[in-house]
C-alpha cells in the first residue's frame, strides 16, 4: 500500500558511516563486565554527560533505516486495520495473511498516530490516511461499545465488541485518545475529524474512573466492577493523568498527579524514578507528550527516562555473561513474544525468567533517549539477521539468536512505539503536533510544570 515514490529499500551501500562508526568510546566486545559495578565503571558516562547528546547524532545509515522502518510500519497500520471500522489488529504475522479478529485499542491509538506520519511523508496517500482516520473516529464514537467513554482493552476488529472478557482499560483508552488528539491537530482542515476527536475526548468520564479514590483505577469489569489495582506507582501513567486533569468535561483534581508514588531506584550508580516493570514504562509517556527541558515538583521526566534507559543498557550488559550475544552492539529486553508465548520481562530489577531473547522495540522505543546507541543496535540487528528478522512490517517482535528463533508476529503497540519515537528523533513531529492540544497545556500548568534550569536536554 506504500505510495509510489516513497522511500524504498534500504541503501546500505550508500555513502555513510559503517555500523558503530561515529559512536564515541565504544567498549571492547570481548571484555564484557561480570557485575553491575563493573558495568557501571566501564560503560556509564560521567554524571550529566549522557543527557547532552543531540538527537541528530546518528549515522546516515541509521537515518536510512529509520526511514525504511517508518514506511514498513505504515503498511502495518494501514493493511492490518479493518476497512470497515479502522480498528487495528493487536498483532499480525511477519509472513502471510492474518485472519485474526482481535483488535487492541492501544494499537489503534498508535495506528491513528502512524497515519499522520504516513501522510506527512507520503508513505501512504495522504487522502487515504485522512479518510481512514475519519472512518475510525466515527466508528469509535458512534458504534464501538463503551462505558462512560472508556473502551475495552481487546475488541472485535469489525464490530468493536468486547473480547476475552477484557476490562474497560483506563491506560489503553488513554493511548487511544493520544492518537485521536494527534489526528485532531494534524488534519486541521477536516472539521469532521476535529469534531469527532473533540467529542470523543469530552465523552470520557475520568472522574468515574477515580472510583472515589485519589488515583485512577486500572479498569472496570461489567460483572465485578472496578479493578482493585490503581495507577498509583510511577509507570507509563504520566500522559494519562495529564489527559484526565486536562479534560474539558470530567477533569480529575491536580492532586491526583501528586498522589502517584515515585520510588527512586539505583542501578550501576544511576538513580531514577521507576516502578518494577519493563522498559516500556519509560517510553510510552514520551511518544506523544514532550517533557524535554521541563520539570514538575518531582522530576524532569525526560532526563529520568534517559537515566532509566542507560541503567537498562548496563543491566543488559551484565546479562551478557549468561547470554554472550547480548553486548554493546545488541541489547534491549522489554515485554514481548517468546518461544513460550508472551512474556512481561526485562530489568532492572530482573523480571523473568530470561532466556536470552532480544526485543527490537526496546531499542527503537528508546531512540530519543540514547540516539546513537539505540540506532546502532537496530542497524546491527538488521545487518546480522537480515530478512529473518526484518520483513514487510519492520522488525519481528522478538528473537533468540542462539537457537535461531525469530518471532512469527509483529505486535501493534511494539511497532507503534518504535515508529513514533523514531519520528520524534528525526523531526520532533509527533511532539510538536500533540503539544498543540490546549488541554495538555492546561494540565501541565495545573501540575506545575515549568522550565528546568538544570536541564541539559535541548535536543532538536
Predicted regions and their residues:
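N-terminal export signals
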Residues: 1-20
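Positively charged, low-complexity intrinsically disordered regions
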Residues: 3-4, 25-27, 39, 46
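Serine/threonine-rich, low-complexity intrinsically disordered segments
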Residues: 9, 34-37
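Generic N-terminal simple sequence motifs
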Residues: 11, 23, 29, 42-43, ...
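Signal peptide processing junction and immediate N-terminal pro/mature segment
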Residues: 17-34
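Ser/Thr/Asn(+Pro)-rich, low-complexity disordered segments
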Residues: 39-460
Amino acid at each position: 500500500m506504500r505510495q509510489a515514490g516513497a522511500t524504498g529499500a534500504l541503501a546500505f551501500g550508500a555513502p555513510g558511516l559503517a555500523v558503530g562508526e561515529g559512536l564515541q568510546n565504544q567498549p571492547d566486545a570481548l571484555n564484557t563486565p561480570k557485575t553491575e559495578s563493573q558495568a557501571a565503571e566501564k560503560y556509564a558516562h560521567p554524571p550529566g554527560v549522557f543527557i547532552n547528546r543531540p538527537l541528530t547524532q546518528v549515522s546516515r545509515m541509521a537515518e536510512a533505516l529509520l526511514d525504511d522502518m517508518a514506511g514498513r510500519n505504515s503498511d502495518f497500520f494501514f493493511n492490518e486495520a479493518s476497512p470497515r471500522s479502522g480498528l487495528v489488529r493487536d498483532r499480525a504475522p511477519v509472513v502471510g495473511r492474518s485472519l485474526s479478529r482481535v483488535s487492541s485499542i492501544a494499537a489503534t491509538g498508535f495506528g491513528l498516530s502512524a497515519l499522520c506520519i504516513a501522510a506527512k511523508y507520503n508513505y501512504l496517500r495522504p487522502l487515504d490516511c485522512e479518510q481512514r482516520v475519519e472512518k475510525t473516529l466515527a466508528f469509535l464514537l458512534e458504534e464501538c461499545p463503551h462505558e462512560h467513554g472508556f473502551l475495552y482493552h481487546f475488541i472485535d476488529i469489525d464490530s468493536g465488541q468486547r473480547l476475552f472478557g477484557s476490562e474497560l482499560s483506563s491506560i489503553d483508552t488513554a493511548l487511544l485518545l493520544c492518537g485521536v488528539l494527534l489526528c485532531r491537530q494534524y488534519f486541521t482542515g477536516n472539521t469532521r475529524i476535529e469534531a469527532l476527536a473533540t467529542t470523543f475526548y469530552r465523552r470520557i468520564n475520568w472522574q468515574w474512573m477515580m472510583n472515589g479514590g485519589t488515583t485512577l483505577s486500572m479498569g472496570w469489569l461489567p460483572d465485578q466492577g472496578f479493578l482493585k489495582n490503581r495507577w498509583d506507582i510511577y509507570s507509563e501513567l504520566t500522559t494519562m493523568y495529564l489527559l484526565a486533569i486536562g479534560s474539558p468535561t470530567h477533569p480529575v483534581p491536580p492532586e491526583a498527579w501528586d498522589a502517584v508514588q515515585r520510588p527512586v531506584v539505583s542501578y550501576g550508580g544511576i538513580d531514577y524514578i521507576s516502578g518494577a516493570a519493563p522498559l516500556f514504562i519509560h517510553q510510552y509517556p514520551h511518544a506523544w507528550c514532550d517533557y524535554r527541558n521541563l520539570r514538575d515538583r518531582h522530576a524532569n521526566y525526560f532526563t529520568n527516562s534517559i537515566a532509566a534507559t542507560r541503567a537498562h543498557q548496563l543491566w543488559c550488559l551484565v546479562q551478557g555473561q549468561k547470554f554472550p550475544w547480548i553486548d554493546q552492539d545488541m541489547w534491549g529486553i522489554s515485554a514481548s513474544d517468546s518461544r513460550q508465548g508472551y512474556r512481561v520481562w526485562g530489568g532492572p530489577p530482573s523480571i523473568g525468567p530470561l532466556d536470552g531473547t532480544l526485543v527490537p522495540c526496546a531499542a527503537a522505543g528508546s531512540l530519543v533517549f540514547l540516539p546513537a546507541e539505540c540506532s546502532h543496535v537496530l542497524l546491527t540487528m538488521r545487518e546480522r539477521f537480515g530478512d529473518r528478522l526484518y520483513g514487510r512490517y519492520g522488525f519481528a517482535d522478538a528473537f533468540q539468536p542462539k537457537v535461531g528463533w525469530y518471532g512469527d508476529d509483529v505486535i501493534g503497540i511494539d511497532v507503534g512505539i518504535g515508529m513514533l519515537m523514531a519520528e520524534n528523533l528525526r523531526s520532533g513531529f509527533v511532539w510538536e503536533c500533540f503539544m498543540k492540544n490546549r488541554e495538555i497545556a492546561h494540565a501541565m500548568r495545573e501540575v506545575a510544570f515549568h522550565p528546568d534550569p538544570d536541564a541539559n536536554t535541548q535536543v532538536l
